[in-house]
Design a protein with these regions (language model features):
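Histidine-centered catalytic micro-motifs
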Residues: 8-9, 102-108, 120-130
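Short active-site oxyanion
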Residues: 64-67, 99-100, 120-121
Length: 145
């Protein structure tokens, strides 16, 4: 199964559109969103084309293709307008003999690891800096759109 992974849209219609174009062009079957979907948070500047309602309108039709976890800027109010679950702190994904631990990164990350087994993959966003790192027994991937 082909997965696309993104994080930290922060309500940007511009980056959401770019992400969905890449999702379509690459023929991915599922889109994993690692949190911070609609709100930019009090410490961050407004992202390019900040338009949470447009992001909602773009993502809701894809609800059956999305797997999302909660970011530190996501709240219960966001869940009220999104047609797909966004409140889980993490998700285990088993795909093509891989076990993936997907989380936002504000709780579990490379300095505070979740329970991982040899060969597992840890996905998280939050840092806004993309990184893929082989850590011996597991692989660390920090994602940002």
């Amino acid at each position: 199964m082909k997965l696309m992974i993104a994080s930290d849209i922060h309500g940007s219609a511009y980056w959401c559109k770019k992400m969905l174009e890449a999702f379509e062009q690459n023929g991915a079957e599922r889109l994993i969103l690692l949190g911070d979907i609609l709100y930019h948070g009090p410490r961050n500047d407004l992202p390019k084309e900040y338009a949470p309602k447009q992001v909602i309108a773009m993502l809701n039709p894809l609800k059956d293709k999305l797997l999302c976890v909660r970011g530190n800027c996501d709240t219960e109010v966001d869940q009220m307008v999104l047609d797909f679950p966004v409140m889980a702190e993490y998700a285990y994904i088993c795909c093509d003999n891989l076990r993936i631990f997907a989380t936002h990164g504000h709780k579990y990350n490379c300095t505070n690891l979740p329970p991982l087994s040899k060969g597992d993959i840890l996905l998280h966003g939050h840092t806004h800096v993309p990184v893929i790192k082989d850590c011996g027994d597991y692989t660390l991937s920090l994602i940002h759109i």
